[in-house]
Amino acid sequence: MSKVILTGDRPTGPLHVGHYVGSLKRRVELQNSREYDKIFIMIADAQALTDNADNPEKVRQNIIEVALDYLSCGLDPAKSTLFIQSQIPELCELSFYYMNLVTVSRLQRNPTVKSEIQMRNFETSIPVGFFTYPISQAADITAFHACLLYT
């Protein structure tokens, strides 16, 4: 079985030094180490829309900025596959199938979903896309057969 990394960012704003120190520097190291057979780096625009649906233009513009930041930090398209989540329709399709396997009550018990709902004051009106983003993440992971997720 091949060793595959899946990593990426939601384009909700510009990347900053914290992104570089926290993950981008390590991604470049992993890319150059040749320890992994494949590295997929996703710009998760569909997931960014789950809590930015009111401003899709912001997300679209940030896709470009994040891609430029990736390149300027040393991520190399010859060594890593850089892609935009929404441009892979199979990810949406796989998410749809997975949604039939997960109950609403299970999503409601997810600690991350619970805390994010409270943080964003969504208690009375939770957008479905936001509520189901963990399913989308599972589809991303399984579609690429990732053995390491690096944030």
What is the predicted role of each segment?
Residues S2-A139, A146:
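N-terminal Rossmann-like or analogous alpha/beta NTP/dinucleotide-binding catalytic cores
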Residues Y150-T151:
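Conserved small/polar residues in nucleotide/adenosyl-binding loops
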